[in-house]
Each structure stands twice: as structure tokens, then as C-alpha cells.
């Protein structure tokens, strides 16, 4: 095994040929598998299992087990939003936390749209995102099933600060795609993506008290509004 300078390992296990670069912090009851590489300034939270031959990229905060794939990155967003295998890369718990991170970039009392397509999977994750957003004091317009162009139009029509649209990847019913949009209905900037990623990785959520939870507005007939407009 190799352990770099300034590392801290608390009550955890390093398996055969695991490599820790400088200033890695591993907290209680975690396991780093054989031949895994943990890069500089990574934080591994308690009770985490990293399976063999994984690479954790620098500055990442690992807060869930790393089983599938070969790498874990600090970055959540890809070239076009966020995508991943349902209940592997993207779980309901992940979606709730990401919803809280997204909501935390707004002031309390702000308003956003959350929509999905008709699949049961997309609808389930829509509700997970909504729970996270509401938990940080942001009001949500819960749209009935919409296609992406209608979701973008809804943001402009309702004059809200942004929106999330959840759908399945074309040709793969096990892969989810999540689009994040700004107040004009356009995809968010890379700067905004980084704000969300930082809030998510640090768990720096603007949690609110019970009496600050905002309304959930259920909109079931937006297509009719769209036709009229």
C-alpha cells in the first residue's frame, strides 16, 4: 500500500495495493478495495465501501458506496445535464440531495418548475427532486407530464427562477436524464453547475424551518395553457 503526506485514516481498512495520494481523509468504518487509487484531498465519509480497482478523482467527497464504474468524480454534470443508470448512478436519495443543492442556489421563497415525462421512473424521481427543493424553502410548480420544449416554455410562462426536467434516455429505459434550466428556460451555465456541485458535495444546503416550507403547486393542465398562448 501507498499512503501520501497528510492523510488521516480513522478506523477504516485499506485493502491490498490501495494507494492514497496526499491529504486524503477517510472516516470511520470505511473500506478501500484492492488496487484502488484515491487522489489528492479526497474525503471519504463514514461507512463507505469502495470496491476494487476504482479511481477517485481529486477533491471528491465520497458519500455513497462506489460499486459500478471505474471512476468517481467531483463533477456531477456531464456535457448535457446529468444522466445515469436508475438506482445505480442516480438513486432517489441522490435526487433528493441534488434537489436540495439546486434549491440552495436560490433565495428562500423563490419559485421553480419541476416536470417529467410519462414514465413511472421519471415521475418517481420528479417527486424526489421536489422533496429536496421544498426542504430549502423554495416554492415548486409540479407539472404534469411534459416534453422538454413544453417544460422550457413553462418556466417563461410562469415567470419562475428556473426548472428541472426529468426523462428517460432515448433507447434505454434504465437510464435517466435530468435537465436543469435557468429563468429563461435555457440550460444552466457551467458556473451555475459548479455552484450546485459545490453545494451537493459539501452538503451546504440552506435548510429551512417547518414554517418556512413553501407551497407545492400542482399544475395538471399546462398543455391547455400552452395551446391558448
Regions found by a protein language model. Give the residues of each.
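Structural signal for interior beta-strand "rungs" in well-ordered beta-sheet cores
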Residues: 1-68
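Structured core elements
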Residues: 2, 49, 55, 113, ...
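Generic secondary-structure signature for well-ordered alpha-helical cores
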Residues: 61, 100-108, 134, 138, ...
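An N-terminal, well-structured beta->alpha segment
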Residues: 71-129, 135, 215-229
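Fold-independent oxyanion-binding glycine-rich loops
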Residues: 79-81, 116-117, 166-169, 183-184, ...
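Gly/Ser/Thr-enriched, mixed-charge loops and adjacent short helices
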Residues: 93, 97, 174-229
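N-terminal small/polar loop signature for handling phosphorylated ligands or for N-terminal nucleophile
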Residues: 111-176
Amino acid at each position: 500500500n501507498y499512503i501520501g503526506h497528510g492523510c488521516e485514516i480513522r478506523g477504516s481498512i485499506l485493502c491490498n495495493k490501495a494507494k492514497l495520494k496526499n491529504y486524503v481523509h477517510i472516516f470511520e468504518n470505511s473500506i478501500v478495495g484492492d488496487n484502488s487509487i484515491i487522489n489528492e484531498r479526497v474525503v471519504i465519509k463514514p461507512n463507505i465501501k469502495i470496491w476494487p480497482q476504482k479511481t477517485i478523482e481529486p477533491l471528491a467527497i465520497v458519500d455513497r458506496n462506489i460499486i459500478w464504474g471505474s471512476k468517481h468524480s467531483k463533477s456531477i454534470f456531464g456535457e448535457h445535464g446529468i444522466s445515469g443508470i436508475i438506482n445505480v448512478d442516480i438513486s432517489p436519495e441522490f435526487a433528493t440531495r441534488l434537489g436540495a443543492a439546486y434549491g440552495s442556489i436560490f433565495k428562500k421563497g423563490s419559485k421553480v418548475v419541476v416536470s417529467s415525462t410519462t414514465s413511472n421512473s421519471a415521475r418517481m424521481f420528479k417527486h424526489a427532486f421536489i422533496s429536496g427543493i421544498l426542504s430549502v424553502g423554495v416554492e415548486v410548480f409540479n407539472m404534469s407530464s411534459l416534453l422538454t420544449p413544453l417544460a422550457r416554455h413553462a418556466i417563461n410562462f410562469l415567470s419562475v427562477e428556473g426548472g428541472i426536467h426529468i426523462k428517460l434516455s432515448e433507447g434505454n429505459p434504465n437510464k435517466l436524464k435530468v435537465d436543469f434550466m435557468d429563468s429563461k428556460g435555457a440550460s444552466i451555465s457551467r458556473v451555475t453547475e459548479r455552484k450546485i456541485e459545490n453545494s451537493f458535495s459539501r452538503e451546504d444546503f440552506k435548510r429551512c424551518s417547518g414554517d418556512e416550507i413553501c407551497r407545492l403547486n400542482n399544475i395538471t393542465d399546462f398543455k391547455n395553457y400552452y395551446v391558448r398562448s
